[in-house]
């Protein structure tokens, strides 16, 4: 019989950890989530006694509980290795109560990544269960139950049977309704812009686009077709001279590593995945040992992971892509000391993952890997050029930029993130102040103001 029992939440996580620890000294079992919860048939909260919750064993889990009790009785030591968040802490607390583990027993271990090094290190630093985390989860669970059980019947009565209300869901509905009222109240306004195709006298140079911006030094607003036509008529009779040329550079910094919300948003925008699907895939990658824990609001990264990322960049791209010191992405008020979402082994790119992973799993891993590696690299640098063109009382502007150093963009090959210039940037020909120009074409464009967009799942 194994000397130690380790309890985790899922069979996949159990299999990965048992592979690292071996079966001779450790048995790893899964609790399949919560073993104890509030009853479904009643409120389950004593509102007269400081909102004390009344827990029961989850239906269908009595046999599992008996098996865990048997294993715990035969083990020299029980370790509770549930997820490293409030929910995981609460599951560990329930397990300790059901398995008769003393509150003072240092039985709780946690790790942000399922690697052999992380698991073995966690076993060396077992601690007692954190009551503050447990109480935070219980407060949330009690509030969920009160809101759901009190509001849902009202919805049944006033709207339709079968509807439900929740602590988060109800607030989201309010946000959606408020936005819809903004949209309904929005009044569309017409406006126009004037664009000119400019050409140097040296016709071998490429033409470029400029936009009308000022009249007598003040910002110009064109509100009608008639005003646009009269403006174009005046411009067509004006002389165009380069009034000002400003050259400079612009840095485009990499984003910090993912947290839960930014991963969900990017997976929605770039992959078309729902938040639920993204978290399911991330959970699978975490349990298989490929990424760190995916429920986090921290952008902190361990020194070891940063060093591994820098080694990959140096070996594959060169030292010029590395900043002198590893970047720090500090975020105050993170719920705990979790790391950001990152690859467990930064040197493993998507092409080196096991063939057993699905296409969807690999796509999410690639998002996480690229974002993390890029976050440890130097910014991209663009040479910029801003030109002011005088045309009588009018002023036009043109902006251009060209990529001088790709920096973190070297990691990306997709157009969504790795494109060299922004969509509104243009390459301008060499220009000097007082240089005359010719307007090959002057054209108006009609626009209408748009109401606020409806929320997408990612935006919410």
Where are these regions (language model features)?
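An acidic- and aromatic-residue-enriched active-site/binding cleft used to recognize and process polar
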Residues: 11, 31-33, 83-89, 111-114, ...
């Amino acid at each position: 019989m194994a000397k130690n029992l380790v309890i985790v939440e899922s069979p996949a996580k159990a299999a990965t950890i048992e592979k690292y620890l071996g079966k001779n000294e450790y048995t790893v079992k899964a609790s399949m989530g919560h073993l104890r919860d509030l009853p479904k048939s009643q409120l389950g909260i004593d509102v007269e006694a400081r909102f004390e919750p009344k827990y029961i064993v989850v239906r269908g889990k009595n046999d599992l509980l008996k098996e865990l009790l048997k294993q715990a009785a035969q083990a020299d030591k029980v370790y509770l290795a549930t997820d490293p968040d409030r929910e995981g802490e609460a599951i560990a607390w329930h397990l300790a109560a059901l398995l008769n583990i003393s509150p003072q027993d240092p039985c709780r271990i946690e790790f942000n990544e399922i690697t052999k090094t992380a698991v073995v290190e966690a076993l060396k630093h077992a601690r007692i269960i954190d009551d503050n985390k447990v109480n935070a989860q219980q407060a949330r669970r009690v509030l969920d139950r009160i809101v759901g059980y009190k509001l849902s019947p009202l919805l049944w009565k006033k709207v339709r049977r079968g509807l439900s209300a929740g602590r988060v869901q109800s607030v989201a509905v309010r946000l959606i309704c408020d936005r819809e009222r903004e949209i309904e109240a929005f009044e569309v306004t017409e406006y126009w812009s004037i664009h000119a195709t400019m050409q140097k006298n040296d016709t071998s140079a490429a033409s470029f686009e400029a936009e009308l911006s000022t009249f007598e030094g003040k910002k110009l607003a064109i509100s009608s077709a008639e005003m646009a036509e009269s403006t174009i008529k005046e411009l067509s009779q004006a002389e165009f001279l380069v009034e000002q040329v400003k050259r400079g550079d612009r840095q485009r910094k990499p984003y910090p590593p993912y947290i839960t919300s930014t991963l969900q948003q990017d997976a929605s925008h770039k992959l078309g995945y729902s938040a639920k699907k993204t978290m399911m895939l991330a959970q699978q990658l975490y349990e298989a040992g490929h990424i760190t824990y995916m429920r986090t609001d921290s952008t902190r990264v361990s020194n070891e992971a940063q060093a591994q990322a820098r080694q990959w960049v140096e070996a594959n791209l060169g030292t010029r892509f590395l900043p002198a010191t590893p970047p720090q992405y500090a975020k105050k008020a993170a719920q705990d000391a979790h790391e950001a979402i990152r690859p467990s082994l930064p040197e493993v790119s998507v092409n080196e993952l096991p063939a057993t992973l699905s296409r969807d799993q690999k796509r999410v891993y690639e998002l996480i890997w690229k974002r993390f590696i890029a976050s440890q690299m130097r910014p991209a640098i663009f040479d910029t050029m801003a030109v002011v063109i005088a045309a009588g009382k009018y002023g036009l502007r043109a902006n251009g930029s060209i990529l001088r150093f790709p920096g973190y963009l070297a990691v990306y090959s997709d157009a969504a993130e790795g494109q060299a210039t922004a969509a509104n940037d243009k390459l301008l020909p060499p220009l000097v102040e007082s240089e005359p120009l010719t307007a090959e074409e002057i054209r108006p464009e009609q626009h209408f103001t748009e109401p606020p967009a409806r929320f997408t799942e990612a935006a919410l």
